[in-house]
Amino acid sequence: MTPMGALADDPAWAAAFLQRMTRMVARDFNHPSIIVWSLGNESGYGAAHEAMYHWTKRADPSRPIQYEGGGSATSATDIICPMYARTDTDMPQGPDLAPKPGLIKWAGLGGENRPIILCEYAHAMGNSLGNFSDYWDAFRKYPRLQGGFIWDWVDQGLNKTDEHGRTVWAYGGDFGDEKNDRQFCINGLVFPDRSPHPTLLEAKRCQQPFTAKLRSRDEISVTVTSEYLFRATANERLHWQYLDEKRVIDSGDVALDLLPGEVSSVPLFPKDLQQRAASWLNVWITQVESTDWSEPGHEVA
């Protein structure tokens, strides 16, 4: 079998590799939305990648470079960027390859301080994202684990009427094509029309910028943590409901006043705190005013 990096080590292909990189950097250099350069995807590792890396670092020392090929941690990447690594266990990769370390183990390996960002993870096909919270627990606990890119955002399907007259999303094989990608076109967080899958709610819950934990049952106060990095909570309100198995006993809302990264105790003062067999506290946070991307009342956590 030809090694995946065969072309990257073939001098005949060196100019093609470099041209692809130099043209991309020239085209996108002045776009502020570009925060990381990529050398490509799933093309092994070889001398051409090293040449692309060093040319780009000279042309633009302000941005980091990421490349997963060759084991995710070669000298041609500023970010360790594994694909589908597990959180706490190693992953076998075949008889001739060393196991891919679990993320927590990877973060503790000596002699290395590059950030770890999964270039792909949480393959969002079908009834997926069941262990998504495990990743985000690890991201929050270990500073070198800095997130990842979900594969992927949107289903690749086309609107089609089936033999029963129903409108369906068509994909691999639905157009009489015998060689196709089957259901691997349908692995996003949203449908082709951008309406959400249930998995989008799971992603939102794990990635929300606030956490709230019950601090005291006696007085019903919660500890709220803001994960905003740059701004205070000037546009957020915390809403709450105190209820038992039969009814909502009390409810209210309070303005949040947190600096970036601040942790604060928020007393809620519900009425009627008599002892009950079971009671619950629901807490959610909304935005008061509209933003460039949300309407008033949008729930952020």
Where are these regions (language model features)?
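Substrate-binding/catalytic cleft of secreted carbohydrate-active enzymes
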Residues: 1-185
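Carbohydrate-binding surfaces of carbohydrate-active enzymes
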Residues: 138-301
